[in-house]
Amino acid sequence: MNPAKRLTGSALLALAFLSVLWSAVAAAEATAERNQRLVERAFVNWSAGRGSLFDDLLSPTVVWTIRGNGPAAGTYHGREDFLRRAVRPFAQRLATPIVPRVEGIWAREDQVVVRWMGTATARDGAPYRNDYVWIFKMDGQRATRVEAFLDLVPYQDVIDRIALADPSPAAPSGERQVP
């Protein structure tokens, strides 16, 4: 084989390799962008009081881990387990739902990181404010794993300070958004 043909063959092989590599990079970027848009949309809807971030974004089989120390820290297996043991007991102690203010969203491949601040009013009239970082691992259009970082002291203060609301049938059944 003459040198010109060998060089042409090598160049074509390199171009083919770069094309495959570029396609993989483009697919990863497209996935990250799609995931970021899904999470952004869920937070926009939550801020506007539309829908339920937990229903709209979480897989029914999500594994949600709250990092840190305290009774709420730990791993919850499934959306319903998380709602039942962490979200509802907290939401029932609030006079207003938590309103999130997103401070940043970053995505890479199948992970989306959201840094946000939440504010609400507790049933005793005291303000609730907390800073959060949630890391979502996305699969399709649903989060299958979430790691949540927050200051558990103000969260636990609300839990300890305010008795659970009366869960009578007359109480509204809508899901409030919290931790």
Q: Residues of each region from the PLM?
A:
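A solvent-exposed, acidic/Ser-Thr-rich amphipathic alpha-helical stretch
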Residues: 56-108
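Hydrophobic pocket/interface hotspot
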Residues: 39, 53-54, 62, 78, ...
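Short, low-complexity N-terminal intrinsically disordered segments enriched in polar/charged residues
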Residues: 15-52, 56-60, 162-179
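A beta-strand edge to alpha-helix "cap/lid" segment located at domain peripheries
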Residues: 27-31, 88-179
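Alpha-helix initiation/capping motif
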Residues: 28-32, 71-79, 125
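Bacterial N-terminal signal peptides that target proteins for export
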Residues: 2-13
